[in-house]
């Protein structure tokens, strides 16, 4: 989907108005759970514009989650352009991204949000939201569920300039999103997305899409 697509639904603004790293409150007011308003938003905006990620979640049998600080029930946001590492070494994060770029990956650590199908992991970072990336997003994942880059590990990729050495260590992929969701690995999402508060809409979405929730 083009980033300049104009949306006419009353809950929307132009997608191009969302700046990198920005989140905009959208949809029903936090003062009350308005089922009718949310169903309008879901059917008219989220379903058609997030069909790729919805299908991946259904095929993977799980939702994608992200934890962040917010009290709003529905948020639309966009990934970062220059995300700062939280738990990883800064220089290694730059090297990691450099290697991903050399291998042709578009979603890297510094320009993405991190999502996971592990609700427990998402809760560690803040309020839990179910994430539906908007069509046209890029993604990358590795076999790791919670990757923190530390110089203490002294792996070969840290000193080698050969992208294949990096590849053999991390085996990054940008296909079969449903597999990544099912396996519960950390996924980098580059693009725009809807975030729906888990404790408000989790049960509704579970019944709507036939996707189970964590026990």
What feature does the model see in each segment?
Residues 21-43, 69, 77, 133-215:
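Active-site and NAD+-binding cores of ADP-ribose-processing enzymes
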Residues 1, 57-60, 124, 180-182:
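A generic structural signal for short, non-catalytic loop/turn and secondary-structure boundary residues
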Residues 3, 8-9, 15-20, 145:
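Glycine-biased, low-complexity coil/linker segments
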Residues 61-62, 97, 101-163:
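ADP-ribosyltransferase catalytic core
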Residues 12-108, 196, 206, 212-215:
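ADP-ribose/NAD+-binding catalytic cleft of ART/PARP-like enzymes
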Residues 4, 10-11, 65-66, 118, ...:
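Aromatic-enriched hydrophobic runs in primary sequence
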């Amino acid at each position: 989907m083009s980033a300049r697509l104009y949306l006419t639904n009353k809950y929307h603004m132009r997608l191009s108005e969302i700046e990198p790293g920005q989140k905009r409150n959208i949809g029903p007011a936090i003062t009350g759970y308005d089922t009718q308003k949310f169903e309008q938003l879901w059917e008219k905006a989220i379903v058609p514009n997030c069909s790729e990620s919805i299908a991946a979640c259904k095929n993977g049998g799980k939702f994608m989650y992200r934890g962040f600080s917010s009290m709003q029930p529905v948020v639309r946001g966009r990934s970062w352009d220059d995300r700062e590492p939280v738990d990883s070494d800064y220089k290694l994060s730059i090297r990691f991204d450099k290697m991903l770029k050399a291998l042709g990956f578009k979603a890297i650590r510094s320009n993405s949000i991190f999502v996971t199908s592990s609700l427990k992991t998402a809760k560690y970072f803040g309020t839990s939201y179910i994430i539906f990336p908007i069509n046209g997003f890029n993604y990358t994942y590795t076999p790791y569920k919670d990757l923190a880059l530390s110089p203490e590990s002294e792996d070969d990729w840290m000193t080698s300039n050969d992208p294949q050495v990096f590849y053999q260590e991390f085996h990054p992929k940008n296909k079969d999103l449903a597999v990544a969701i099912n396996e519960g690995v950390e996924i980098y999402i580059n693009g725009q997305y809807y975030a729906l508060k888990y404790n408000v809409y989790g049960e509704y979405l579970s019944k709507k899409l036939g996707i189970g929730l964590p026990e």
